[in-house]
Structure formats: structure tokens, C-alpha cells
UniProtKB/Swiss-Prot annotation:
<feature type="region of interest" description="Disordered">
    <location>
        <begin position="396"/>
        <end position="415"/>
    </location>
</feature>
<feature type="compositionally biased region" description="Acidic residues">
    <location>
        <begin position="315"/>
        <end position="329"/>
    </location>
</feature>
<dbReference type="GO" id="GO:0000122">
    <property type="term" value="P:negative regulation of transcription by RNA polymerase II"/>
</dbReference>
<dbReference type="GO" id="GO:0005634">
    <property type="term" value="C:nucleus"/>
</dbReference>
<dbReference type="GO" id="GO:0019212">
    <property type="term" value="F:phosphatase inhibitor activity"/>
</dbReference>
<dbReference type="GO" id="GO:0003714">
    <property type="term" value="F:transcription corepressor activity"/>
</dbReference>
<dbReference type="Pfam" id="PF02996">
    <property type="entry name" value="Prefoldin"/>
</dbReference>
<feature type="compositionally biased region" description="Acidic residues">
    <location>
        <begin position="227"/>
        <end position="265"/>
    </location>
</feature>
<dbReference type="InterPro" id="IPR052255">
    <property type="entry name" value="RNA_pol_II_subunit5-mediator"/>
</dbReference>
<dbReference type="GO" id="GO:0003682">
    <property type="term" value="F:chromatin binding"/>
</dbReference>
<feature type="compositionally biased region" description="Low complexity">
    <location>
        <begin position="157"/>
        <end position="168"/>
    </location>
</feature>
<dbReference type="InterPro" id="IPR009053">
    <property type="entry name" value="Prefoldin"/>
</dbReference>
<protein>
    <recommendedName>
        <fullName>RNA polymerase II subunit 5-mediating protein homolog</fullName>
    </recommendedName>
</protein>
<dbReference type="GO" id="GO:0009615">
    <property type="term" value="P:response to virus"/>
</dbReference>
<comment type="similarity">
    <text>Belongs to the RNA polymerase II subunit 5-mediating protein family.</text>
</comment>
<feature type="region of interest" description="Disordered">
    <location>
        <begin position="200"/>
        <end position="329"/>
    </location>
</feature>
<feature type="compositionally biased region" description="Basic and acidic residues">
    <location>
        <begin position="215"/>
        <end position="224"/>
    </location>
</feature>
Amino acid sequence: MSSQEIFKKYEQKVVEYQDHIEELKSTKNDYKQLIDTLQHLPDTLQPKIMVPMGKLAFFEGNLKNTNEILILLGDNYFAKRSSKQTIDIIQRRDKDIDTSINDLREQIKGLKQRVSMTTDLSKALHEKEYDNIVEIKEEYNSDEEREKEKKRKQKPQKSTTTTTTTTTSKDKPKTEEEKKKSKEMDEEFDKMLKRLSILEEKENKMGDDYDEEEFNKKFNKKLDITGSDEEYDDDNYNNNNDDDDDNDEDDDREYYQEEGFEDEKPENSNYNKNIEEDDHDDDDDYYDEGEEIVEYYDENGNIVDINDPNVEYIQGDDDNDDNDNEEDEVDVELNESELEEIKDFHMDKKGQDLSEKEVKELTDFYHSKQKKRISYIDTPQPPTPEATTSITPKSILKTNSSGNLMSTIPKSYNENDENDIRRYIKNLDKQEKFENQKTISVPNPPKDVAFSGDIVEKETDLFPFDEIPKPTPPSNAKQSRFKSSRQNK
């Protein structure tokens, strides 16, 4: 292709891009006008317009629903939007048009640069023709290249043969000096490994109280890495590691012999003995000779820890406690009414639970009252003028522990005395009877039930049904003339 044809193609491309830019600019102007009209349409209800009837004919008309606009989305798809939404859509399309215009301008610049490059090259070629410049030409033979490639492949094979010869030279028998050096290196390596294994064992035994600096100082003082082979014999070392866990004392002795801690050996050898003695002493102190050991069992007979939060403790009836109580108590014959009075010693006037101490005081007081055979006959007696002189059951128990109860407790029963224990017991008895007699009020079920869930025959008298009365016409109803004339006849 000549340079002139190339220039023509570049010029045609530039013209096409410029035409496309002008089309985009025209659409941009149309969008601006459309935005102006959409902004003014909602101002009036029915604006007047000229409706086109073909290319030349128009007639007057009015727009309705100015806020509803159909927008073409593409491929004959439309969507209803308000005027504000359509303005936003048009502005976005306007931005896309600006970006496409900028891209076309950049492409035009690129084409112009190519045109300038081609002109420069064409000028250079014309100048070289006049300067008598000769091109270099060489013959090409594929056979020669193949031979060269074969030679290149043979070179790395030779290098591999040389490496094999060197390896065979290394496999020659070693001298005595080399053997000694290798043995020394192996021994040093074995000693280092032994030292590391000892350090790991010591660290595992020490646990959290392990300090690397202190242990390394002691270890370096006691242990000679360059020692004789007798101290670090492989057979002895392996035998020590293969012993069972049951022989702890023998393992400790061999371990300290290997480490060289001779000073600490007697202390640690007696360590287990001291621990056993301490445990024995603690057991003797904890379990005295005259003390009982209490154990707790579940329903299946298994021992249970009472401190476990997942276990509920249910106190059983112990035989020993019953025997002790029988020795302390005195046999007292009680009537049925007296037994009912004892029932509610655990409740106060308000129905709240009493503490264990208060219940014990009341029971002791009641038994002492039965021993002294206090009369329960109701005798009228004037009320006491001073309420402060009356004594509560607790104060009676505290003050009359040494003296007689008869000096403070009146023999006759007084209903008005609030501090009398007999009145308190009777009130509790009444409260218990009232709670037992309480019944929950249930609403009475209806007598006539429409359907109870059972199948019943139609002609039965189980459900009384009233006959439906016939509708009666209203008194003031108007009749037609035709109907009234027929009735009169």
C-alpha cells in the first residue's frame, strides 16, 4: 500500500468520529430542552399544546396527568415515572454522552499521531533511496542449525559423566585420620543430643518453677561435655530410659548420676519418703480416734461427694439420732387434740416458716408444759392491765431455765392475752382447718348444650326446641288498591 492510500483511510476514520460526535451533541441539546419542559409541566394542571397530525398538520390540545411520563428503557419497554425521576434519568444519560464524546476525541488524537509517524517514515525511506544504502542478505540452511542443536544437547551429557567420575573418586577408602575425625564428630554430636534430652526431662519435672538460666549454670558446672565415654555410654543411657515407671527411685538415682548433681541426690532420694510421712501425719490429724467418718451414698449405693453442685442432698432418718432423742425426751401421753396442736409449730401467725431455733423452743416449752400437767380449762379472768408484764414464750424459756414454770405461766386460759402460747397454737389450728376446707369455685356448666359431641336421634326429647313463630305483618303497612278491592269482594 502506498502512503497516499494510508492517509485516505486515516482521514475517513477521523470524519466518521467527528460525525458521531456531532450526533451526540444534538442529542445532548434535545435532553436539555426536555428537562426545561419537564420542570414547567407540573406548574399547571392541563397545559395547552399543538398535537401533530402527520408531518404538516397540527391542532390544539391539552395535556392530562402531567406528572406521569413514559420512559423508553430499550427494546420497546416503557416505564411510568414522575417528572422528577425522569429528570434524574436524563441527567445520567447526559453524563454518558459526555464520556463517549471524550473517548472519540482521544481516538481522533491517536489517529493523527499515527498519520504523523507514517509521514516521517515515508520521508526517511525516500532519503535512503538517494543515499545508496544496501541491505544485508544471508542464506539460510536448516541442516546446519540441526547439527548445531545436536552439539548443544551432547554437551550437558558430558558434564553428567564428569560428575559421576568425581563421585567415584570420593568413594575411595578413607584414611585413619579421617576416620578419627568422623568418630570425634559423631561423639560430640551424641553428647549434645544427650544433653538436650536431659534438659527436656528436667524441664518436664520442674514444671512451672523451671528457670533456664539457673539450671544451665548448675548443669554446666556439674556436667562435663568432653568427659570420658564411661559416663555417657549409649547402652547405659538407653537402659535407663527403658525402665518402668513403677521404679521411680532407681530412675531418679540413675538420672542424677548422669547429670552429676551429687549434692542434691540425698535430698531428692528421701523426697518421696518425706511426702509419705507428711501424708500419714495429716491423716492422723484429720481422722481422730473417737471421730466418726460420714459418707454419702446415692439410691444405687454409690459414694457421692456432697460438695458437688449437681448433687441434691436428702436427709434420711438416722437410727443414732432417734436413740439420742428418745433418751432426752420423757414419755408423755397426749390426746388427739393435743397432737393436732403440735403439728404447726413451724408456722407463725402470718403463715411464714419459723427458724429451727424457734421451733425447738416451742417444742421444749410444750413438753415441759405436759410434764407439769398445766390445766387447759377455760376460766374467765379479767384482762391484765399492763401488757408489759406478760411474758412471751421465748422470754419464758430464757428466764425460767433455772426456776419453775408455774411461777410465770397462768394456769387459766385467757382468750384476750396475745402472748399466751395456747392461743397461738389454736390460731394455727384454725388456719390449717381453713386451708384444708378451701374449695375452688368452678362455674356451673350450662343445662342446655347445643352439641356435646354425641350422636343423638332427631325425634328425641333430650333437647327442648321452641317452635319458630311465623312473621306477622306490621299494623301500619300500606296495601295496594288492587289487593284491597279483592279482599272487599
